[in-house]
Amino acid sequence: MKYALKIIHKAQKDLDSIKGKDFNFIKKKILSLSSNPRPFGCNKLIQEEGYRIRAGNFRVLYRINDFEKQVIIYRVKHRKQSYR
């Protein structure tokens, strides 16, 4: 069953600052989450609720609401910033 994608305002600002090939690759990864919100290679976050997937040099941070069938994207960060 497909999940609805919801992008929080901060994540949208993060995406707006990314250009070119990186943006297209991240967009493709985010869209794939609607059919499989827990793909191979996703990591469950330890310090906060949610998951992380790699998209090149960027990390997409998101939460899954199985009850409402939603994937909520809350941050898209460069890998250097996401591990701080």
Across the structure, where does each feature detected by a protein language model lie?
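A short, surface-exposed loop/turn module that caps and links secondary-structure elements
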Residues: 28-54
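Enriched for short, Lys/Arg-rich terminal
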Residues: 2-24, 55-58, 63-84
